[in-house]
Amino acid sequence: MKRLKKRQIGRVVCTILQQLAITTPVHVVYSWGITNKTATQINVSMNGRKRFIAALMMEVYGFNYCGKLYITLNSVKQTFGLYTEKNGMLHEENSDIPFEELGKFLDTIIETGGRSQQEHYQRLQEFLHRR
C-alpha cells in the first residue's frame, strides 16, 4: 500500500478547510468546540481494496458528538466523506456529502443530531435545567 506525500495531504486538507470556511458561518464552526486540527492520512477500504487517503482530523466537543472526525475529499465526484472514530476504529458516516452541504452536514452530526431547530432548542433547555 502506497502512503501519500505530505504535499498531497496538505493540498487536500487546504481544500477541505477552504470549503468549510466558504460555506459555514464562523459562529457555527466555533460551536463545535474544535480543539485540534491535523492533516493526516487514513487507511480505508474502497472497492474492496485498502488504500490511504488524505483527511482533515478534527477533535470536536459538540452537544451531540464528542471525539475525532475525519473529513476526506473525493475530487473526482466532488464530494466529501466523513468518518468518526469510536474505540480506535474508523466508521464511515457518509461518503457522498456535496461540496455546498459540508458545513450543514457536520453541524448536524456534531450539534443537532438531525433534530429540528425547535427540538434541538428544547433539548438544550432540558440540559441546562438539569444542571
Give the label of every model feature segment.
Residues 35, 42, 46, 73, ...:
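Intrinsic-disorder/low-complexity regions
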Residues 2-63:
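Negatively charged, low-complexity tracts enriched in Asp/Glu with abundant Ser/Thr
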Residues 2-6, 37, 50, 68, ...:
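Context-gated lysine
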Residues 2-12, 88-131:
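Mixed-charge, Lys/Arg-enriched low-complexity segments
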Residues 29-33, 51, 62, 79, ...:
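Intrinsic disorder/low-structure terminal segments
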Residues 65-97:
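Intrinsically disordered, low-complexity regulatory segments enriched in Ser/Thr/Pro
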